A protein has these predicted regions:
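Outer-membrane beta-barrel biogenesis signature
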Residues: 19-43, 50-55, 256
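Outer-membrane beta-barrel "beta-signal"
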Residues: 40, 241-256
Length: 256
C-alpha cells in the first residue's frame, strides 16, 4: 500500500513541472542599437555653378562714363574631393576634405565713353575672357536629421581656405584694335560653406551621399595687365565675391 501514494506523488510532481514549463514564455529579444562612432573616408564628384559679385579695376574710374553690357560670369566646371571624417554619435559628425575645382571659363563685356554735344560718345569696348580654378581646404560639421529605412537627411556648415587662380586672362578692345593680357595669379582667401543633402546606407560600411553646397570662395585677381607688345603695364583685374552653388555625389566608407 505504501507504493501507491509514492507513485501518485511522483505523477503529481511531474505534471506540476510540465504545467509550469507551459506557463514560461521566453522574453522577446531586445533590439540592438545601431553602432555609431568611428572614422570614415569620404570622396565626391560634382559640378559648380558659380557667380561673380563684381569685376573691378582702377582704370574704370579714369573714364567719364563706364558701364557693363555683360557683368560677367563663369561657366559650370567639374570638381572632385577626398577627405576623412568622424561620426561622434547617431546625429553628429565632422570631416575635413581637400577639393580641386576645375577650370571655369569667364567672360564679360563693358564699354566706356564721354559726354559730347549730342549726348554720350562711346569710345570703345572691352571684351574680357579667362579661366578660374581653385584648390579648397575645408573643415565641416553636420547634423543628421533622423534615419528612415537607411535614408538620412542632413545639414551642415564649414570653414576653410580657397586658393583661387585666374589664368589665360585677356582684354580685347575691338574699336581701338587693342589687346592686353594678364599673367596667371593665385590668391588665398577665407572660404565658408553651407551644406544640405541626403545619404543612403548601402551596407554597414558604405553610404552614398547626394549633396548641395553653397560656397563663398572670396576674391581673385589676375597678374599685371600688359599690352600685347609689352609697351604698357597696368594693375591687376580684381574678381570680387566669388560664390557657387555646387551639386555633389559622393560616398562615405566607415573604418570601424
Amino acid at each position: 500500500m505504501t507504493r501507491l501514494p509514492i507513485a501518485f506523488a511522483a505523477m503529481l510532481l511531474a505534471s506540476t513541472s510540465a504545467f509550469a514549463a507551459d506557463l514560461y514564455v521566453e522574453p522577446d529579444p531586445q533590439p540592438v542599437a545601431p553602432a555609431f562612432g568611428g572614422f570614415y573616408l569620404r570622396g565626391h564628384l560634382g559640378m559648380s555653378n558659380q557667380q561673380l559679385g563684381s569685376l573691378e579695376h582702377t582704370l574704370f574710374d579714369d573714364v567719364e562714363i563706364h558701364e557693363f553690357l555683360d557683368e560677367g560670369g563663369f561657366d559650370s566646371a567639374p570638381l572632385a574631393g577626398i577627405g576623412v571624417g568622424y561620426q561622434f554619435n547617431d546625429w553628429l559628425r565632422a570631416d575635413a576634405f581637400v577639393e580641386y575645382r576645375g577650370d571655369a571659363s569667364f567672360s564679360a563685356l563693358d564699354r566706356y565713353g564721354h559726354t559730347g554735344g549730342a549726348g554720350t560718345v562711346w569710345d570703345g569696348t572691352n571684351d574680357y575672357s579667362g579661366t578660374k580654378s581653385e584648390w579648397l581646404l575645408m573643415a565641416n560639421a553636420y547634423v543628421d536629421v533622423g534615419h528612415w529605412h537607411g535614408i538620412t537627411p542632413y545639414v551642415g556648415a564649414g570653414i576653410g581656405a580657397s586658393r583661387n587662380t585666374i589664368s589665360h586672362f585677356q582684354d580685347v578692345n575691338v574699336p581701338t584694335a587693342g589687346v592686353s593680357y594678364g599673367d596667371t595669379a593665385s590668391t588665398w582667401n577665407f572660404a565658408w560653406a553651407l551644406h544640405a543633402g541626403v545619404a543612403y546606407q548601402v551596407t554597414d560600411r558604405m553610404t552614398l551621399d547626394l549633396g548641395y553646397s553653397y560656397m563663398n570662395l572670396g576674391d581673385a585677381k589676375t597678374g599685371d595687365l600688359k599690352a600685347y607688345d609689352g609697351s604698357v603695364t597696368n594693375e591687376p583685374m580684381h574678381f570680387k565675391d566669388i560664390t557657387s552653388h555646387d551639386i555633389k555625389l559622393g560616398f562615405r566608407y566607415s573604418l570601424q
